Swiss-Prot record:
GO terms for cellular component: cytosol. Substrate binds at residues 10-12, 32, 62, 119. The keyword Oxidoreductase applies. Pathway: Cofactor biosynthesis; tetrahydrofolate biosynthesis; 5,6,7,8-tetrahydrofolate from 7,8-dihydrofolate: step 1/1. NADP(+) binds at residues 11-12, 19-24, 48-51, 67-70, 100-105. GO terms for biological process: dihydrofolate metabolic process; folic acid metabolic process; one-carbon metabolic process; response to antibiotic; response to methotrexate; tetrahydrofolate biosynthetic process. GO terms for molecular function: dihydrofolate reductase activity; NADP binding. This is Dihydrofolate reductase. It is an enzyme of class 1 (oxidoreductase). Its EC number is 1.5.1.3. It comes from Staphylococcus haemolyticus. Keywords: Antibiotic resistance, Methotrexate resistance, NADP, One-carbon metabolism, Oxidoreductase, Plasmid, Trimethoprim resistance. Key enzyme in folate metabolism. Catalyzes an essential reaction for de novo glycine and purine synthesis, and for DNA precursor synthesis.
């Protein structure tokens, strides 16, 4: 269907797949945010309306494509799509697009994803938003790097990259 488009996702999650609580991220790891910025810079990102509203602004140096059912939704410096197909159509000239969450967006797009950039935080947080269950037998880990724990990064965490096995 969209074989011309490289579809990746990027996510940080804890040991129980928590990705959020009360429309926010329950941790602060500055090097993960740097990793996200550097990885997605210059690319399109697809995210849900709630995720955008929790961030509060379009992310600079990348196309922000917002998937929402709200036909009246508008947001400065963002493009709006009302279906997966419409979001992909907006990205047809992109080299790589990143699925940026939240939970419902990950669930909807996971079947199309070829590559996952996953920061795994070795801690358990309270949460109400989760990354979907993934059968990692269908994925090959191509990279893993331990993050540096310090005062700005107070948890053990690892950057993993997985590619779907075809």
């Amino acid at each position: 269907m969209w074989s011309f488009l490289k579809i990746s996702l990027i996510v940080a999650m804890d040991k129980k797949r928590v990705i959020g609580k009360d429309n926010d991220i329950p941790w602060r790891i500055s090097s993960d945010w740097e990793y996200v910025k550097n990885t997605t810079k210059g690319h399109a990102i697809i995210l849900g309306r709630k995720n955008l509203q929790s961030i509060g602004r379009a992310l600079p140096d990348r196309r922000n494509i917002i998937l929402t059912r709200d036909k009246n939704f508008n947001f400065k410096d963002c493009e709006i799509a009302h279906s997966i197909e419409a979001a992909f159509k907006l990205c047809e000239n992109e080299e790589e697009v990143f699925i940026f969450g939240g939970e419902q967006i990950y669930v909807m797009f996971l079947p199309y994803v070829e590559k996952m950039y996953v920061t795994k935080i070795h801690h358990e947080f309270e949460g109400d938003t989760f990354f979907p269950v993934v059968n990692f037998d269908d994925w090959k880990e191509v990279s893993v790097e331990k993050g540096i724990k310090d005062e700005k990064n107070p948890y053990d965490y690892y950057f993993h990259i997985y590619e779907r096995i075809r």
